[in-house]
UniProtKB/Swiss-Prot annotation:
Coiled coil: none annotated. GO terms for molecular function: GTP binding. Homodimer. Interacts with host CD247/TCRZ; this interaction induces down-regulation of cell surface TCR/CD3 complexes. Keywords: AIDS, Host cell membrane, Host membrane, Host-virus interaction, Lipoprotein, Membrane, Myristate, Viral immunoevasion, Virulence. It is a lipid-anchor. The lineage of its organism: Viruses, Riboviria, Pararnavirae, Artverviricota, Revtraviricetes. Residues 88-96 are annotated as: Acidic. This is Protein Nef.
Length: 255
């Protein structure tokens, strides 16, 4: 019975990977080498004295999500098909969600530290590391964890840029890292206008292209709160005047 449950869970998680890869740029994706910063093409795939807030109860901030995946055709013969796929993607973004349950399979629950750590390792096995970030992929990940695991989608928020964006949910071990798209990719005529990799930097107020990076140290090092406590507002433990002044200085809106 345990083996059967494991196979079922694996099947659902594989569907997640497939949906993430299909989101604006399936087939092939360029992933950044963690050690040298190089790209390889693969088939898709201090706050002392302050009380650190958990990831529970944070508001879902649609519109904070930035940047998109990258893909280059493997061979010259694929370029026509690739260009057509880019056009098809414009009209078929909802197709990426086919197969997601309409209602959660389990009772809804808030994200907790332990759950965030467990889900982080689970998602890592599905190949999220090095995948380019996009609004669609953000939405797919939220929807998957809501429908399959019952996790209320109010937790996946990251600090503002520029630079590395750290998770505001303590226990979520994924950060968003800015990368430079290669000049060769820039010059590829199939990428002009239609592909999100060319337009993603215009979506980001800082003009950066981001990818997901797994960072196990985030399990005990609450970088978001340590580096940017002002982004937690009233939960930061800072005087209201101080955290508002810091947000204003960084050009971050607040209410």
């Amino acid at each position: 019975m345990g083996a059967s449950g494991s196979k079922k869970h694996s099947k659902h998680s594989q569907r997640l990977r497939e949906r993430l890869l299909r989101a604006h740029g399936g087939g092939y994706v360029q992933q950044c080498n963690a050690s040298g910063g190089e790209y390889s093409q693969s088939q898709e795939g201090s706050g002392k004295g302050q009380k650190s807030p958990s990831c529970e109860g944070q508001q879902y901030r649609q519109g904070d999500f930035m940047n998109t995946p990258w893909r280059t055709p493997a061979i010259e013969g694929q370029k026509k098909l690739y260009k057509q796929q880019n056009m098809d993607d414009i009209d078929s973004s909802d197709d990426d969600l086919v197969g997601v349950p309409v209602t959660p399979r389990v009772p809804l629950r808030a994200m907790t530290y332990k759950l965030a750590v467990d889900m982080s390792h689970f998602i890592k096995k599905r190949g999220l590391d090095g995948m380019f970030y996009s609004r669609d992929r953000h939405r797919i990940l939220d929807l998957y964890l809501e429908k399959e695991e019952g996790i209320i989608p109010d937790w996946q928020n990251y600090t503002h840029g520029p630079g590395v964006r750290y998770p505001m949910c303590f226990g979520w071990l994924w950060k968003l890292v800015p990368v430079d798209v290669s000049q060769e990719a820039e010059d590829d005529e199939t990428n002009y206008l239609t592909h999100p990799a060319q337009t993603s930097r215009h979506d980001d107020e800082h003009g950066e292209t981001l990818l997901w990076r797994f960072d196990p140290t985030l399990a005990y090092d609450y970088k978001a709160f340590i580096l940017h406590p002002e982004e937690f507002g009233h939960k930061s433990g800072l005087p209201e005047k101080e955290w508002k002044a810091k947000l204003k200085a960084r050009g971050i809106p607040y209410s």
